[in-house]
Regions:
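Beta-rich carbohydrate-recognition and catalytic domains
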Residues: 1-52, 60-123, 131-183, 195-198, ...
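Beta-propeller and closely related beta-sheet repeat lectin domains
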Residues: 55-58, 126-129, 187-190, 246-258
Length: 298
């Protein structure tokens, strides 16, 4: 039950003492001076939570050795209960947790929350994904939602940090590098830094205003302009799309992407859910192998 989890979920981490994976006992991620039941400012077990939104919420390592964990936290209202605007479902802020090495252990600090405007995104800021830009800024791209308010435009949202992930600019709709807005459903997405220096974003771009989570197709890969932190319009390439005869509920989402060391391409793990019908939760687990070309992927 997601609503029950929104009052309980917390994060744990584990470390390995060797180059080969040999995990040590896991531990709850808690800011110094806080407790298991109150692990961060404004987080209280039993009332709200801190969690990872999806597999695409990959931690980011900074040049100074710090680790940024792109999490999200449910929000408490003035009455102390879980907050959700009218017509919404769950409601979260993006919440980055910074880990720094001290004495052989990670010391955790919760960054300033990145809060959405419920009048523009009815589920707040969801499932952040991170990348480091050449000028030292950290780029965070986020999922929003117009759930329950389909008249609102469905966008991706973006925020930047200039201090290593502790303070963030107010979120704004993400655009192409030329400033034009694009539509995107409420779905996960991933920023992926390639060893050739390019920065890619993988997610769903919709041809018209989406309705909440739909449509979650086509799935695209796009190159990010690293000067502006915006998408390069000419660098958008389709990975997959709805095929003739497939249900409109098709979901090309909830994936995970990684660079393949052997080929330099990108492997994308995804199950094409609901291709036959909206209630059919059976689907093959697929791996897409993407060959990269300048300006995008083929």
């Amino acid at each position: 039950d997601p609503l029950r989890g929104m009052r309980q979920w917390q994060l744990h981490s584990t470390l390995s003492a060797r180059a080969r994976w040999s995990p040590l006992p896991d531990a709850q991620i808690i800011q110094d001076g806080y407790t298991a039941d109150h692990p961060f400012p404004d987080v209280y077990r039993g009332r709200n939570c801190v969690m990872l939104g999806d597999l695409t919420c990959v931690p980011l390592s900074l040049p100074d050795g710090s680790l940024l964990v792109p999490a999200q936290s449910s929000v408490l209202g003035e009455d102390g209960a879980l907050y959700a605007p009218p017509g919404g479902f769950t409601y979260t802020d993006a919440f980055i947790i910074r880990g720094q090495w001290r004495g052989g252990r990670l010391v955790w600090t919760g960054a300033a929350r990145v809060a959405g405007d419920p009048a523009r995104s009815t589920r707040g800021m969801i499932e952040p994904t991170l990348a480091l830009l050449p000028d030292g800024r950290v780029l965070m791209a986020m999922r929003g939602s117009n759930h329950g308010a389909p008249h609102l435009p469905g966008y991706r949202w973006v925020s930047f940090s200039e201090d290593g992930g502790l303070r963030w600019t107010p979120p704004e709709p993400w655009t192409y590098a030329d400033g034009e807005l694009f539509y995107s459903p409420s779905a996960c997405a991933q920023l992926l830094r390639h060893t050739d220096g390019a920065l890619y974003w993988i997610g769903n771009i919709a041809p018209r205003n989406p309705n909440s989570n739909s449509p979650r197709y086509p799935l695209v890969i796009a190159e990010v302009d690293q000067r502006t932190g915006r998408l390069i319009r000419d660098g958008v390439r389709a990975i997959d799309d709805r095929r003739p005869g497939e249900d409109a509920a098709l979901t090309l989402s909830n994936f995970y992407a990684r660079e393949e060391r052997e080929t330099g391409g990108i492997a994308l793990h995804l199950s094409r859910l609901f291709a036959r019908s909206a209630g059919d939760w059976t689907a093959d687990a697929l791996v897409y192998h993407l060959t990269l070309n300048p300006g995008g992927a083929a």
